[in-house]
Amino acid sequence: MKKQLLAALIGGFLLAPMAASAADYVIDREGAHASITFKVSHLGYSYVVGRFNDFSGDFSYDAKNPTAAKVNVKVNTLSVDSNHAERDKHIRSGDFLNTAKFAEATFVSTSVEDKGNGDMVITGNFTLNGVTKPLAIQAHAVGEGQDPWGGYRAGFTGTTTFAMKDYGIKMDLGPASANVELDLVVEGVRK
C-alpha cells in the first residue's frame, strides 16, 4: 500500500505541469502592433491628438501571477507626430518636450496590482523632460497565444493621465489643457 501511494505521488508529481513562470516579451513596434498616442484638450473646445513613432521596450508577464510583471519602455520624444509639422516643432521646443536636451522619455515599472479579469494597475517611474515621478497606468490584458509564424504573443491596452506642470512643462495653455492623456496599445513577441 505504501509503495502504491509513493508511486502515485511520484507519478503525479512527474506528470503535473510545472508552475508557470513569467515569460519575457519584446514590444512589437516594428510590426506596427503597438502604439503610444496622446490627447490634450485644445483650449477646452476640441483635442490635439498625436503619437510617438519611435519607441522600444520589453516586459515580463505571467497571466497566473500578474503582480510579478515588469515593464520597461523608452520613447524617442523627437518622434512626436501630431499631423502638423509646425505644431510638432513647437511641441519639441523648450516650451514642451525640450527634445534638444531630453530626447528620451522612459517608464520603468515598480509594482503591478492585479484587479482581476485581466485588469491591472501598473505603477512605475515615468521620466519626461528630465523629471522622474511615479505614474500609474490602468492596464488590461487583451489576450495571448500562438501566432501564425510560430511565435507567441501577448497584448495589452493601457491609459493614464498626467499634468504637464508635474514634468516641468511650464507652457500654460489654460486649465482645460493642463493634462495629457496617454493611450497605449502593446503587443509583445515572446523572446
Swiss-Prot record:
Residues 1-22 form the signal peptide. Keywords: Periplasm, Signal. Pfam families: YceI. It is found in: Periplasm. SUPFAM superfamilies: YceI-like. GO terms for cellular component: periplasmic space. The keyword Signal applies. It comes from the Bacteria. Transmembrane segments: none annotated. Belongs to the UPF0312 family. Type 1 subfamily. This is UPF0312 protein Shewmr7_1249.
